[in-house]
Amino acid sequence: MTIAKDMMVNDGIRARELRLIGQDGEQLGVKTKAEALQIAESANLDLVLVAPGAKPPVARIMDYGKFRFEQQKKEREARKKQKVINVKEVRLSPTIDVNDFNTKLRNARKFLEKGDKVKASIRFKGRAITHKEIGQKVLDRLAEETADIATVEQKAKMDGRSMFLTLAPKNDK
């Protein structure tokens, strides 16, 4: 059951007739608004409209304050469980040396193990743009070296004077 910030409660309900549900979930039938309010007040609870679009609208007898608190608690828990995925960038060059490549590879692996995506980019300077295949080989090697912990989300593609490759961590769940 989702909660709207402006749920109609007690006197805020405009419908004349309501299908009433008791606090323990049993159907109490169709009642007038006055009867439903009287039943709710006698139990020291609130009358909350839960399905305004139904014919007749459905109202439930409950402790509205407690209900709001529980819903907010659920929303907070759901927000805590959400994982924010960051995209980290590793910049390479087409003429990268072996040790430099290994350092960049180590950084990329570290990001992937943390659960972040990795965007590997190669910037071509000057006339190096004529040898795109060299940059392609560097990115392919990076994808190959991280194949055990990552999948290629976006294959290497040119964008202006740069070539990009996106890697996403594999889900082992």
Curated annotation (Swiss-Prot):
Record NCBIfam families: infC (TIGR00168)
GO MF: ribosome binding; translation initiation factor activity
GO BP terms: ribosome disassembly
Subcellular location per the Swiss-Prot or TrEMBL entry: Cytoplasm
This protein's GO CC annotations: cytosol; membrane
Disulfide bond entries: none
Key words of the record: Cytoplasm, Initiation factor, Protein biosynthesis
Chain's gene name: infC
Entry protein name: Translation initiation factor IF-3
Role played: IF-3 binds to the 30S ribosomal subunit and shifts the equilibrium between 70S ribosomes and their 50S and 30S subunits in favor of the free subunits, thus enhancing the availability of 30S subunits on which protein synthesis initiation begins.
Lineage summary: Bacteria, Bacillati, Bacillota, Bacilli, Lactobacillales
UniProt similarity note: Belongs to the IF-3 family.
InterPro entries per UniProt: T_IF-3_C_sf, T_IF-3_N_sf, Translation_initiation_fac3_CS, Translation_initiation_fac_3, Translation_initiation_fac_3_C, Translation_initiation_fac_3_N
Superkingdom to which the source organism belongs: Bacteria
Organism: Enterococcus faecalis (strain ATCC 700802 / V583)
Entry annotated with the keyword Cytoplasm: yes
